[in-house]
């Protein structure tokens, strides 16, 4: 009886191991649809401390996609740090359109006709891999194909009609409520804020390990 019992135990153990293996094999892995949902990876962050008139309204932190659009990101980071001797600090958001976007980055003239990149006055469109998926995406303003400089805009709604025309390179990670404050500021007939919207301070925040964000 003892030998039979041992044999039965071995059979039961083997059956349990097989069942466990089958269960493991049946567990669903990541589907192709899940993989497609993964967004671009944030490799570095930049912060803006914004002021409207005399009021400090808060900090906006951007996540930038250095693996997807490295040249565009390097330009934005260098202009935020001022490491080339020029950049965004004390420049204005010169154009604000509610339910569309806020635009800044013209640190040479302040009216949307100026600005320059770290590569020269203009540089080519890097790629259009990313789209304007919704509020908070950061994209290069331009005057047509291959005319990127320093001007950029932050979407406040989905702007699909800009896809393939403007290079998307970042997303607001924190401070979207600050962007909304800027979006709600009063403007004149040419979309210029009645009170100056200033980047009072800006700089770079290192990212230890790149992380993906959703395309939304």
From Swiss-Prot:
**One GO biological process from the UniProt record?**
neutrophil chemotaxis
Keywords recorded for this protein, A-Z: Acetylation, Disease variant, Dwarfism, Endoplasmic reticulum, Glycoprotein, Isomerase, Osteogenesis imperfecta, Rotamase, S-nitrosylation, Signal, Virion
In short, the EC number is 5.2.1.8
> Signal peptide position in this chain?
1-33
Q: Any idea which GO molecular function terms this record carries?
A: cyclosporin A binding; peptidyl-prolyl cis-trans isomerase activity; RNA binding; RNA polymerase binding; unfolded protein binding
Q: What is its main location?
A: virion
Q: What is the effect of changing residue 9 to R?
A: In OI9; patients have white sclerae, normal dentition, no rhizomelia or severe deformity of long bones
Q: Where in the cell is it found?
A: Virion; Endoplasmic reticulum lumen; Melanosome
- Record protein name field: Peptidyl-prolyl cis-trans isomerase B
Organism classification: Eukaryota, Metazoa, Chordata, Craniata, Vertebrata
